[in-house]
Amino acid sequence: IITEVSGVTRHSAILARAMGIPAVLSVKGVTDSVCDGEMLIADGFKGKVITDPSEAELKKYRKKNDEYQKEKESLSEYFGKPTVTKSGVLKKVYGNIAKAEDAQNVVQNGGEGIGLFRTEFLFMDRDHAPTEDEQFEAYSTVAKALDGKEVIIRTLDIGGDKAVEYLNIDKEENPFLGFRAIRYCLKNTELFKTQLRAILRAAQFGNIKIMLPLVTCVDEIKQAKALIAECISELESEGKRYRDVPVGIMVETPSAAIISDLLAEEAAFFSIGTNDLTGYTMAVDRGNANVSNLYDPTQPVSYTHL
């Protein structure tokens, strides 16, 4: 995949990486300078595109690809083994998924849980929102595949660089600072409750947790938990099986990092979203190649937030 726009943390890049597709993004003028059927080399490691490669370049990159595939195969020896740091601390390695069918890949590759189920992708590439039963099927499929291992489901994280036309979100000058993620869900409670009900119902099949995106204040957690309580009451009155689940948040804004002690009183767990946290802290549009040099998670302020 080669695109003219999109930075290294855009979701197109995230999905390409997850699917093992070589990708080079933000290549200015590529659509004008490349013709259909033209031979290209996309070097996703160096972020380089070679047009009309010579035989020597083709030979070089075929060799590189063979070496890369062998390196991937060599990692199989670590399958099923515990993950331990040099200092002897035991860790768990989780996988992130965008579709229910991705869960099996996590299991097959030795993943010890799902750290992030990006549920927004269930809402994309369609002309209406998924029903409660459709979402229930997706979430329960993942829970069953993980067989008791932890599954963290992030509620609808829409807006910003993830547009869904049928949700009718107004075009904004600064979409990353606007009506998105938990802000959208708390204003569209029926859509939100449909998702929450599906998650609660699916929780009976595994170790599911709910994670709220882009939280900036304590009240957002309280409002979400109140809606979850409403959903539980409804499911009980309808005689539908469910399981209550822990509710955590993504810490991906400077405000959440600064008041993390207060948020911890309401949230069962934190997940640090370094992509957005870095972007908001450094005041950098993560999809703008002109300022991408400022997008650096190793800046001292990033460690201050952590």
Regions of interest found by a model, annotated:
Residues 1-111:
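Acidic, glycine-rich flexible loop/linker segments
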Residues 73-306:
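Conserved alpha/beta-domain cores
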